[in-house]
Swiss-Prot record:
InterPro entries: KH_dom (IPR004087), KH_dom-like_a/b (IPR015946), KH_dom_type_2 (IPR004044), KH_sf_prok-type (IPR009019), Ribosomal_S3_C_sf (IPR036419), Ribosomal_uS3_bac-typ (IPR005704), Ribosomal_uS3_C (IPR001351), Ribosomal_uS3_CS (IPR018280)
PROSITE patterns: KH_TYPE_2, RIBOSOMAL_S3
Keywords noted in UniProt: Ribonucleoprotein, Ribosomal protein, RNA-binding, rRNA-binding
GO MF, any single term: structural constituent of ribosome
SMART domains registered for this protein in UniProt: KH (SM00322)
Listed CDD domains: KH-II_30S_S3
Protein's recorded name: Small ribosomal subunit protein uS3
Record text on subunit structure and interactions: Part of the 30S ribosomal subunit. Forms a tight complex with proteins S10 and S14.
Length: 232
């Protein structure tokens, strides 16, 4: 089943944190979820050239805090922080509550599945041969310390009449191992022959002991009972 299930979804709460962390009542849940979707859609469209990895949304006390993980923080921030202020105002308007924007830099974009997939997509749109783009991405990831990487492209590869899939892998990608830190993402390239889909799996090693305490959810349980001292 490791081949069928979504690699990120099956690891949530084990070695993967959620991209949205908030709790809501039944009547507010749908509005919050719709607001999250619109905020992500807006930021993804606005920051197409900023090498966007992922967007984390938190909702503390009738406000919204958005953390943007990007390989090019300067593009997001803009000159003297002007662009961030515009984004904050736009997000506050969409969500309907005060907004805060945080920027987190992705130090090694070659080890981020979303950024690797987007890079391959942009190369395919520039008519680079798909095998060359795949091999270059795999070699860069392995050179920077990945334990394993697999890239799959599907569609009318090279302008072929019949669509097909091809994949390239180096190292290990253990999808059945839940403690394995596997970064998975999808991307798409819009070429003159049609859309080509790209899937990327990057294995960074095993995480022993689960998520860090900051991301893990503390289990709710009864307080340990005090032991009575026996008579001597």
């Amino acid at each position: 089943m490791g081949q069928k299930v979504h690699p990120n979804g099956i690891r949530l709460g084990i070695v993967k944190p959620w991209n949205a962390t908030w709790f809501a009542n039944t009547k507010d849940f749908a509005d919050n979820l719709d607001g999250d979707f619109k905020v992500r859609q807006f930021l993804t469209k606005e920051l197409q050239k900023a090498s966007l990895s992922r967007i984390v949304i938190e909702r503390p006390a009738k406000s919204i805090r958005v953390t943007i993980h990007t390989a090019r923080p300067g593009v997001v921030i803009g000159k003297k922080g002007e662009d961030v202020e515009k984004l904050r105002a736009a997000v506050a308007k969409i969500a309907g509550v005060p907004a805060q924007i945080n920027i987190a830099e992705v130090r090694k974009p070659e080890l981020d599945a979303q950024l690797v997939g987007d890079s391959i997509a942009s190369q395919l749109e520039r008519r680079v041969m798909f095998r060359r783009a795949m091999k270059r991405a795999v070699q860069n990831a392995m050179r920077l310390g990945a334990k394993g990487i697999k890239v799959e492209v599907s569609g009318r590869l090279g302008g072929a009449e019949i669509a097909r899939s091809e994949w390239y892998r180096e190292g290990r990608v253990p999808l059945h191992t839940l403690r394995a830190d596997i970064d998975y993402a999808t991307s798409s390239a819009h070429t003159q022959y049609g859309v080509i889909g790209i899937k990327t799996w990057i294995f960074k090693g095993e995480i022993l002991g689960g998520m860090p305490a900051a991301n893990a959810v503390e289990p709710k349980g009864d307080k340990p009972k005090k032991q009575r001292k026996g008579r001597k």
